[in-house]
Amino acid sequence: AVFGCGDHNWASTYQYVPRFIDEQLAEKGATRFSARGEGDVSGDFEGQLDEWKKSMWADAIKAFGLELNENADKERSTLSLQFVRGLGESPLARSYEASHASIAENRELQSADSDRSTRHIEIALPPDVEYQEGDHLGVLPKNSQTNVSRILHRFGLKGTDQVTLSASGRSAGHLPLGRPVSLHDLLSYSVEVQEAATRAQIRELAAFTVCPPHRRELEELSAEGVYQEQILKKRISMLDLLEKYEACDMPFERFLELLRPLKPRYYSISSSPRVNPRLASITVGVVRGPAWSGHGEYRGVASNDLAERQAGDDVVMFIRTPESRFQLPEDPETPIIMVGPGTGVAPFRGFLQAREVLKREGKTLGEAHLYFGCRNDRDFIYRDELEQFEKDGIVTVHTAFSRKEGMPKTYVQHVMADQADTLISILDRGGRLYVCGDGSKMAPDVEAALQKAYQSVHGTGEQEAQNWLRHLQGTGMYTKDVWAGI
């Protein structure tokens, strides 16, 4: 039996490996006693896992004659906590083979009258860290002081308090075990504190709640349908519930144990090492807006943390090369098409820097087209650089404005549709196509526009166009670096 754990934000590879393993096991002669399940860590993962486990255990009982034992709702914590003096740090950096780097520059890309914030952040890399265009830079962020203070206040603790953690029976590898650490550092660097509460967390909160009416309310929140509407869609965290239900007497160590490890956030690198191998830049859209709960403001953990960093500040980071072959062609004469609205332009800035260096070295460049989209002139990030690249013959820039006064709403796929002959000609000549950005709406719309363009230019049907696009993907002529936020 196979259950796949994935993240739909990585749309192009979601559940690929679990499906492959399941198919290979069957082909090699293994007997599938229960259907494969799928879990999305950016969705109702726990609910999906619970449903799969119910059917899997029922199938296992039939296949192997097993018996199930129900666990008690109120589990005893496997963590023990002792207040001590001293200082420690999170071991998460080791698990990702991360390095300490420093911020070299942090500047705003949006115009002064824009209601958005996008930061251009340059990071001075350690001597042993290398990267190439198209790579991702992973950042281990710090939780906001506001959320850390909320936790400390709820449990009546001080950030300067020092503790030593020990654990038994359950994995706690993300926590700094066996050495002193301040509660402030522990909560800042080790755990996710503003994720939507899981059903398991809600059940535990209910088990520790001494007020019967409040306990019933919490139990009802984990019910099917109610959980999705009241918790998941509103991003209600375990901390939010603890503040609302003061009769919950959950010990701090149990609360800490139930929190998930702090996850790294990945950003497409927006620079080229051919310009400066010791500097890597990222382009960060700062996430701020009304909370889905209807109360207060929601702030993205990493984007707001990075937005506040200043030159000289430390950042814990690592480099990852995506498996999608999102790199420039080896032959600089190969024509390329780049589609990157908003912060999706990030990796293409690195591509264009590399092409500029190649041209300076005397290399002949194939034609390059960049399709960039934004709301209006105020959101046109890297405008001066892109216009200079175009003047220097590095790229042809095609811009789509979705909210420009006096102009119809236009997205990148609309501009591409108007240039069907040019696009299909480039791809027919062996050109490369790259798409970066939103994978839930933009990327599918771009693919639909490309298929219609192929049908129009070559006079084929819908199926032939679909096969053509699949062929481009299968041969690496079309690669994506996309995400699909909830």
Language-model segments: residues:
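FNR-like FAD-binding dehydrogenase module
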Residues: 1-486
